[in-house]
Amino acid sequence: MAATLRELRGRIRSAGSIKKITKAQELIATSRIARAQARLESARPYADQITQMLTTLAADAALDHPLLVEHPQPKRAGVLVVSSDRGLCGAYNANVFRRSEELFSLLRDEGKQPVLYVVGRKALAYYTFRNWYIAQSWTGFSEQPKYENAAEIASTLVDAFMLGAGEGEDLQTNNEQSVDELHIVFTEFKSMLSQSTEARRMAPMVVEYVEETGPRTLYSFEPDATTLFESFLPRYLTTRVYAAMLESAASELASRQRAMKSATDNADDLIKALTLMANRERQAQITQEISEIVGGANALADAR
């Protein structure tokens, strides 16, 4: 009985220690989520403006840029998987990996070989453990991505896409560094309680038109619209990668906040249940000790 009581008290102490950790993680995630949301909201006007500019240029430019042209026989599809660097965020990474596997299956059914690029230590560890070939990985900034990080990633992806563009089917098929399509898997932030894992194609690109609220403005371009259009396309792709990373960062923090709150609540419930069991055990122990004392006293009285 004494051993059982010691075990219960040990479990209560362990649950209390875990509760301190989960509560701290919950508070940290709560403090960071507001900044992540602010960064996401502040980046949207820029994304809308560059999309609007690209739309305006597309009205006058000849749309024959390699980033807009479908490959006649696509064989390799680059997939950028955006995960987290740290755990303790519920099913956030599991949902990303599940959506990625669905995309890989779809690409294989279409006769395309997936070429993997990953963001975040969790994706790197997940696919390394499963012996996947990873073309390139980026880690260390999943919670606070910078535009420079997105620019580096987008540059790598564009280089892989452009490597075989226009060079002939044999070169593009045989070159292990080239891809014919680009896709991204990330988590879209909708609210603190709602996030969805998305898989979207980035290249060949389809320009997303932003509807103008007022009269359409006519522009005079210097240099010509086609040159500007070609200059803006890589920047547009960088913006899409950056936006996806900001969405994922906010989603990661929201998932961690919810997961840690749930863990803290569960620890509270466990501590209450164990405390009740310990109290009952202690009461039973005291009752037994009293019974033994009374029994001993009665035995002495009878002996006299």
UniProtKB/Swiss-Prot annotation:
**One Gene Ontology cellular component annotation held by this UniProt entry:** plasma membrane
Which PROSITE patterns does the record associate with it?
A: ATPASE_GAMMA (PS00153)
Q: Which UniProt keywords apply?
A: ATP synthesis, Cell membrane, CF(1), Hydrogen ion transport, Ion transport, Membrane, Transport
> Keyword Chaperone on this protein?
no
The cysteines covalently paired via disulfide bonds are: none
For membrane topology, the record states: Peripheral membrane protein
Please provide an example of a Pfam family that matches this protein in its UniProt record: ATP-synt
An example Gene Ontology biological process:
proton motive force-driven plasma membrane ATP synthesis
Instruction: Report the domain of life of the source organism.
Output: Bacteria
Q: Is-annotated flag, keyword 4Fe-4S? A: no
Q: Where in the cell is it found?
A: Cell membrane
Kindly list the GO molecular function terms attached to this UniProt entry: ATP binding; proton-transporting ATP synthase activity, rotational mechanism
The protein's job, in short, is:
Produces ATP from ADP in the presence of a proton gradient across the membrane. The gamma chain is believed to be important in regulating ATPase activity and the flow of protons through the CF(0) complex.
The record's family statement is: Belongs to the ATPase gamma chain family.
Assembly, per entry: F-type ATPases have 2 components, CF(1) - the catalytic core - and CF(0) - the membrane proton channel. CF(1) has five subunits: alpha(3), beta(3), gamma(1), delta(1), epsilon(1). CF(0) has three main subunits: a, b and c.
User: HAMAP family under this entry?
Assistant: ATP_synth_gamma_bact
Question: Under what name is this protein listed?
Answer: ATP synthase gamma chain
Naturally occurring in which organism (per UniProt): Mycobacterium ulcerans (strain Agy99)
